[in-house]
UniProtKB/Swiss-Prot annotation:
Keywords: Cell cycle, Cell division, Cell shape, Coiled coil, Cytoplasm, Phosphoprotein, Septation. Belongs to the DivIVA family. GO terms for cellular component: cytoplasm. Residues 34-135, 199-236 form a coiled coil. Gene3D superfamilies: 6.10.250.660. This is Cell division protein DivIVA. GO terms for biological process: division septum assembly; peptidoglycan-based cell wall biogenesis; regulation of cell shape. NCBIfam families: DivI1A_domain (TIGR03544).
Amino acid sequence: MPITSLEIKDKTFGTRFRGFDPEEVDEFLDIVVRDYEDLVRANHDKNLRIKSLEERLSYFDEIKDSLSQSVLIAQDTAERVKQAAHERSNNIIHQAEQDAQRLLEEAKYKANEILRQATDNAKKVAVETEELKNKSRVFHQRLKSTIESQLAIVESSDWEDILRPTATYLQTSDEAFKEVVSEVLGEPIPAPIEEEPIDMTRQFSQAEMEELQARIEVADKELSEFEAQIKQEVETPTPVVSPQVEEEPLLIQLAQCMKNQK
């Protein structure tokens, strides 16, 4: 067991003859005790410091181990992240290449489809254009034939009979008129003894005005039907037929009118 400063201070020595001076020994012991106490105190402080340093060293060792472990984990994580990023980048590049190839194929297909449709449309337009040209040629030929046929009708000699003056026409048709009137009335028509002059100032009766108005309406209707027939013949050519003068209906109407007046 180590000696303490108190034991040094309380230490007593036996005396002998011609021994050391007790006072000097006590003074020296006091000095030794003081220095020893200082040494013990310093040693204690150093032990405390050493302990503190050892604790700090242990703490730093733990931190070092933790940091080393963290570094290892970080390195491992970084390596795994790097590997995952590399794999992901490769996957992205591969997927992008596949998408680009797919888009390229789709673009080529659509371009070919558009080109095919454009070609088909161009062919269709060309065919339709040719059909329109053929129809135009047919229509032109029909129109030409119709116009020629109408011109032939207009230039026909039959129009001379139609366009003759009324007096001449009535004179040349007198016999036919008499026959029709005789047939309608059921009695022969006597020869006129003397022609009475036509009274241009005579006023028409209400019945005559209505009959005249009815005849005008009938004539307008026949004119409209004739114009419609001409228009239809222009659109759809028909064989050329020479105009025939329909004298009988008009003569019959006149004869009937005369019979009613009687």
